[in-house]
């Protein structure tokens, strides 16, 4: 809760949010965003973010999704190599699927879950993009079962925590529907 409040303080008012228009990409790629959300960032690092609005998104709309991996066998013995593979895969995913209109960043939670933030200018249907990402990741990681949970479109960075929770809630459909597909929060009954 403290971290989320800090993020909300970073962003400030919506008008100021739109005026500053800084990018989240360098911080997501270096793991700073993940560290803040997970509560692992040192106090002095968090202080740097309180200085200015470093976490503003480039465009007003965003969707958070989570990519979940289930492995055959136990990857723990090779956890470090899995981590490097997954991080390299998502660097490639962000390079391939980011365009002038859509910016995608990721943060690595662990070898089982990677969060993606898809940021875009106009509110639009993005389902096809998530299916394409799922197909690409599934093909690249053929030794695992890849499932995605996708939150709804949001336009307030103050809802970052809810967006992460929404993506995880969509992913809960694994329990009743199975793995190896994309689940959207808007399709769940009690969204």
Describe the function of each predicted region.
Residues 96, 133-140, 170:
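Conserved short hydrophobic interaction patches
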Residues 150-152:
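Short Trp-Ser/Thr-centered turn/loop motifs at beta-strand boundaries
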Residues 104-111, 135-148:
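Catalytic core regions of nucleotide second-messenger enzymes
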Residues 2-128, 154-159, 164-175, 180-191:
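Interdomain helical linkers/hinges and coiled-coil/dimerization scaffolds
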């Amino acid at each position: 809760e403290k971290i989320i409040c800090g993020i909300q303080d970073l962003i400030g008012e919506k008008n100021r949010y739109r005026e500053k228009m800084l990018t989240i990409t360098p911080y997501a790629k270096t793991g700073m965003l993940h560290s803040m959300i997970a509560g692992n960032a040192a106090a002095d690092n968090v202080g740097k973010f309180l200085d200015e609005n470093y976490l503003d998104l480039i465009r007003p709309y965003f969707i958070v999704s989570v990519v979940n991996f289930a492995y055959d066998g136990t990857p723990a013995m090779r956890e470090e190599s899995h981590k490097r593979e997954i991080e390299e895969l998502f660097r490639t995913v962000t390079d391939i699927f980011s365009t002038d209109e859509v910016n995608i960043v990721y943060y690595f939670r662990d070898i089982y879950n990677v969060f993606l933030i898809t940021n875009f200018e106009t509110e639009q249907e993005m389902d096809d993009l998530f299916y394409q990402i799922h197909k690409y990741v599934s093909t690249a990681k053929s030794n695992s079962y890849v499932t995605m949970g996708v939150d709804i479109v949001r336009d307030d960075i103050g809802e970052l925590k809810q967006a992460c929770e929404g993506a995880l809630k969509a992913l809960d459909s694994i329990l009743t529907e199975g793995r190896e597909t994309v689940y959207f929060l808007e399709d769940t009954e009690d969204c």
